[in-house]
Amino acid sequence: DGRAICLQAIAFIEQQRGRCMTNEKYGRERTLCFLPLNHIFGLMTNMIPTALEGNPQVYLHDRAPETILKTCRICKVELIMAVPLLINGLSSALQKKVSKLSAPKRRAFRALQNTSIAIQTAWPEGGMWIAKHVLFKSVNAQLFGPTLRQIALGGANAPQEHLRNIAALGYCVSFGYGMTETAVTAYDGAVDMKARLSGCSGKLLP
């Protein structure tokens, strides 16, 4: 049943994090319903277990880039499950804007990126907060906003260059793998920088 499926999924994630799950979590984690629900990825993530856990879902008026970003900011979205095209496009647009800056500003931006990656490598959770709320506060105010905790991707790989650009902003990007016949079969929810930049799909679900 739906409750059992939810508990199995949560238990696997907690096992990966090295924690012991002692009770069920009925959260208020706002999830962006980005994926079509008639697709196996959307069905098995936005419907099962997200909806069955009681988490509120945010629906898009359309899938224009600005609509996605504005919706996330206004509705304070915390979790996005999508395909790599989302962050690839965002990273490319960011790089294009940076390339138009003056040379000193470009160097300053790159220095902030390197600083952010270094802090997150040493202190993943705290580093993400610092990157999101301090180093790139003004940038994130124009993107997903400060509330977004995780972007879970599936369906394809993403270039490391794009993963690094998004990670530097303080957003945690993770990957999973699945097929139409089996739904989600693997997931990597690690927050350390090495795992986030590897693009690894993680361990097989039990």
Model-based region annotation:
Residues 6-30, 37-133, 137-138:
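Conserved AMP-binding/adenylation subdomain of ANL enzymes
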Residues 2, 28, 179:
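ATP/adenylate-binding site constellation spanning eukaryotic-like Ser/Thr protein kinases
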Residues 1, 46-47, 62, 163-166:
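Composition- and surface-driven signal marking solvent-exposed, interaction-prone regions
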Residues 58-59, 124-127, 141, 146-154, ...:
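Conserved ATP-binding loop and adjacent catalytic segment of the adenylate-forming AMP-binding
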Residues 2-3, 35:
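Structural detector for helix-capping/boundary residues
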Residues 3, 85, 156-157:
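Alpha-helix/helix-capping structural signal
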Residues 30-35, 150-153:
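Extended hydrophobic secondary-structure segments that form protein cores and membrane-embedded regions
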Residues 4-5, 87, 178, 195:
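Tryptophan-centric aromatic hotspots in well-structured domains and transmembrane helices
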